[in-house]
């Protein structure tokens, strides 16, 4: 019984010891996370305060401390890289950032990968912090990486800051750095990745005297100084207070410089505002003038359009009237011609077209002259032949007689007849048609019997 009770007691003690180690480890991890997040918040505040007085660059101690803090946060409980032999080699947070921040639009991952003077992963991670601050996208990078929870779980162990609730606080704190203009040299000594980053906690440590304390801070410092060495006197405590006074004087001087700078900026902005107001007033006046011109142009265009529409309507009316007059004139002309000229059946058989007779008379005279000239020519030819060959004179006389007979009996074909009559009259056209239909004009009797003759 005693042995069993001792065994059970030892088991209970062993279990309690294991639980104590776990709780202690959890407490240490929580304290570590809280310390890093708190000091990061202080570092961001000091950076913002420092940026009001001077430009933040690689030589600024506030930035160097902030970069070390951020590097410690991103490296907190980072898993090692497993080799082929099963060993874990140390890994930099750049390996995680390179994978998790690929989705950021216009990211600088490829640019940092291609940098010639940066070779190690730690140096590339430090270069990424500087570039992200200059681009004012550090908060966006961290937020995008934290949203990729699967990748984050693959790179970090349980209890890491990026896997806890402190991660959201980290992204919110870094958002305030977007208001600061950073200027870094990516070829400096700060990118050396051979040494790990070390955090300086002294700027953020301040002793707060408790309410139960009896002595003041000065008396306690004097007592501690006298107990530490006999040579310590109250006079030796003076320099810190003088340093405080100097620090206040320096702060006052910086505030004065900041006030002067702000005053100059205020004057510049007022002058710029005055210039912009003048430009705005000129633009407004020009806009009014242009609007008035546009209104006048619209009015003129409307009036011109109305006038053109009125002219179009008037021209259409005139065209309609002209068309009606033309139609009426055609009808009157048709009626007049119909009433003036009788039908072909009503024409007198003895009626002869005057213009046809005149044409026949003119052609007859022309034919007579032509025949006379031909007779003379044939007579001369016959005389010449008779003189040359008397025996052939008789034969030539016979040919001459035959030629005369043919000329007398020749008919007038339509191809030799010109146009007769006037084409402006319907009756003349009818007379010409009758002439063509008869093919020849044999005698006046035939001409008078044609149906299309014009009255004399």
UniProtKB/Swiss-Prot annotation:
Residues 8-21 have a biased composition (Gly residues). The modification Phosphoserine is found at residues 215-216. Keywords: Coiled coil, Methylation, Phosphoprotein. PROSITE patterns: RUN. It holds the Pfam family RUN. The keyword Coiled coil applies. Residues 224-235, 382-405 have a biased composition (Polar residues). Belongs to the RUNDC3 family. This is RUN domain-containing protein 3B.
